[in-house]
């Protein structure tokens, strides 16, 4: 596989942004160690925006010959008050539920979970030189920049927070350098931390990424954030600028069960959630059901996606590209209910191996039902 083919795998849907493609090409060309990482807070049930979006990209990275790693951010979750702010509970959930759920998600998206290294944050945070790296980074970042970066925690600028939360962004940047990560991966909501990492990379004294004497900047790969199924807080949305302002409120949320499908949901739960989903007729710009179709079903194109309908409503129709589907929906040739039902059936089949695993091994879900899920 040549360099351009490997780059195309990194750019493949659901990737939304690479900072930068030129730097990625440079890493391939100089033969730098290719170490990926994606970090997750341990905060509740795994939904499709976490399991399938990250799983899809991990599969792509593996095909491109990149070592893959999942960072189970237990301390970060504690700082951000997840699971009642109980560090021991967070660690138990990380190892007994989250790790298993992500392994199964990677598998259904075509990756090999056996080739993913899982690292618990506390395994490295106990090392003294980790905190040297945190301080080194912090000395190169202003307080106002840190305050603007708290949105990576799902917090709003101006929100009242405890001091520990100001350490969080610098820890997230330190995680990259301390682990020798050359490809930092996350959803678009983590962009601010990754931009800081790129900007400070060549200023660091502790744990810079060095290859053949050159201080390297990490590449940041950001995947699409699936829209939540709920109606947006403002409707209609009249501009792209307005959409950007409320996008954070439109993503899937573990605390709003009907905004998300979880990887273990039953067929009936999936159908019910899709039936209730916001999906206005002819609306193609701000439509969560179409958004899911584009980034899950039509991740690979061409594909075959068949929508079953009674003959009196046009009969079955098969689409091979998302643009075909989008065009028919925009023209009113495809009814929202038919689209919802077809997407639900696709997800039911896709998630079947995960569902069956948890039916055979109920202990992880039993653990989750016993813990306090917060935020």
Swiss-Prot record:
Molecular function GO labels: ATP binding; tyrosine-tRNA ligase activity
SUPFAM superfamilies according to UniProt: Nucleotidylyl transferase
Keyword tags: Aminoacyl-tRNA synthetase, ATP-binding, Cytoplasm, Ligase, Nucleotide-binding, Protein biosynthesis
One protein family per Pfam: tRNA-synt_1b
Cell location: Cytoplasm
Catalytic activity: tRNA(Tyr) + L-tyrosine + ATP = L-tyrosyl-tRNA(Tyr) + AMP + diphosphate + H(+)
Keyword rRNA processing: no
Annotated positions binding L-tyrosine: 37, 168, 172, 175, 190
GO annotation, cellular component aspect: cytoplasm
Binding positions (ATP): 254
InterPro entries, per database record: aa-tRNA-synth_Ic (IPR002305), Rossmann-like_a/b/a_fold (IPR014729), Tyr-tRNA-ligase (IPR002307), Tyr-tRNA-ligase_4 (IPR023678), Tyr-tRNA-ligase_arc/euk-type (IPR023617), Tyr-tRNA_synthase (IPR050489)
Residues spanned by motif 'KMSKS' region: 251-255
EC number(s) on file: 6.1.1.1
A Gene Ontology biological process term: tyrosyl-tRNA aminoacylation
Family classification: Belongs to the class-I aminoacyl-tRNA synthetase family. TyrS type 4 subfamily.
PANTHER family given in the database record: TYROSINE--TRNA LIGASE, CYTOPLASMIC, TYROSINE-TRNA LIGASE
Complex formation: Homodimer.
HAMAP family recorded: Tyr_tRNA_synth_type4
Job description of the protein: Catalyzes the attachment of tyrosine to tRNA(Tyr) in a two-step reaction: tyrosine is first activated by ATP to form Tyr-AMP and then transferred to the acceptor end of tRNA(Tyr).
Protein name: Tyrosine--tRNA ligase
Native organism taxonomy: Archaea, Methanobacteriati, Methanobacteriota, Thermococci, Thermococcales
């Amino acid at each position: 596989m040549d360099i351009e083919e490997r780059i195309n795998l990194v750019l493949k849907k659901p990737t939304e942004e690479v900072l930068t493609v030129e730097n990625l090409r440079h890493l391939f060309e100089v033969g730098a160690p290719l170490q990926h990482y994606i970090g997750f807070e341990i905060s509740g049930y795994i939904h499709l925006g976490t399991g399938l979006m990250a799983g899809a990209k991990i599969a792509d990275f593996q095909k491109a010959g990149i070592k893959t790693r999942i960072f189970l951010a237990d301390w970060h979750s504690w700082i951000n008050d997840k699971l009642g702010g109980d560090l021991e509970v967070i660690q138990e959930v990380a190892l007994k539920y989250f790790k298993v759920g992500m392994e199964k998600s990677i598998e259904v998206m075509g990756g090999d979970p056996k080739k993913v290294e899982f690292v618990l944050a506390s395994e490295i945070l106990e090392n003294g030189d980790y905190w040297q790296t945190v301080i080194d980074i912090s000395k190169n970042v202003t307080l106002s920049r840190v305050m603007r970066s708290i949105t990576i925690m799902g917090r709003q600028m101006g929100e009242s927070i405890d001091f520990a939360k100001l350490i969080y962004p610098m820890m997230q940047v330190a995680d990259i350098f301390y682990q020798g990560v050359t490809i930092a991966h996350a959803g678009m909501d983590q962009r601010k931390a990754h931009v800081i990492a790129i900007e400070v990379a060549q200023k660091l004294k502790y744990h810079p990424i060095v290859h053949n004497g050159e201080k390297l900047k990490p590449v940041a790969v950001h995947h699409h954030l699936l829209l939540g199924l709920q109606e947006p807080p403002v409707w209609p949305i009249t501009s792209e600028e307005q959409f950007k302002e409320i996008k954070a409120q439109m993503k899937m949320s573990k605390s709003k069960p009907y905004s998300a499908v979880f990887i273990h949901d039953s067929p009936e739960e999936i159908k019910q959630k899709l039936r209730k989903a916001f999906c206005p007729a002819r609306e193609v710009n701000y439509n969560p059901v179409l958004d899911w179709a584009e980034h899950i079903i039509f991740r690979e194109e061409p594909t075959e996606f068949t929508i079953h309908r009674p003959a009196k409503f046009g009969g079955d129709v098969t689409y091979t590209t998302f643009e075909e589907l989008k065009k028919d929906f925009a023209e009113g040739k495809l009814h929202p209910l038919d689209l919802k039902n077809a997407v639900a059936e696709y997800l039911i089949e896709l998630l079947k191996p995960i569902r069956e695993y948890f039916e055979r091994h109920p202990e992880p879900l039993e653990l989750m039902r016993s813990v306090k899920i917060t935020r």
